[in-house]
Design a protein with these regions (language model features):
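Nucleotide-sugar donor-binding/catalytic module of glycosyltransferases
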Residues: 1-111
Length: 111
């Protein structure tokens, strides 16, 4: 099935929030396919390990980009690392310390 939406999520030391964020993205109810691309910018609080666990549990849905060195501090745009993975016609964004409370958010935005 063709990917309609790519959800881009950036994280850095979002350990207290990332599980709720990812669960809210996975809970989306749509009649189209979507993917989640998570970029972790070398977190030191266990965020990257959580992201990796989710990517392994949902390999068809979540793609993880895990940095060993913080790219933002080097002046790099972290979206450069996500761009090659994007397959969706549309892009949505949810930061790693945020979440979506409406399980039909994507469906409403696309249709």
């Amino acid at each position: 099935m063709e990917i309609m939406v790519s959800i881009l999520t950036t994280t850095y030391n979002h350990n207290p929030y990332i599980i709720q964020a990812l669960d809210s993205l996975l809970a989306q109810r749509t009649n189209f396919a979507y993917e989640i691309i998570v970029h972790d910018d070398a977190s030191t609080d266990g965020t990257a390990e959580i992201v990796q666990t989710y990517a392994e549990k949902y390999p068809d849905k979540i793609h993880a980009v895990l940095q060993k060195e913080n790219q933002y501090s080097k002046g790099r745009n972290v979206y450069e690392f996500m761009r090659p993975l994007i397959r969706g016609k549309y892009i949505a964004q949810c930061e790693g310390d945020d979440y979506w409370c409406d399980e039909y958010k994507l469906q409403r935005q696309v249709h």
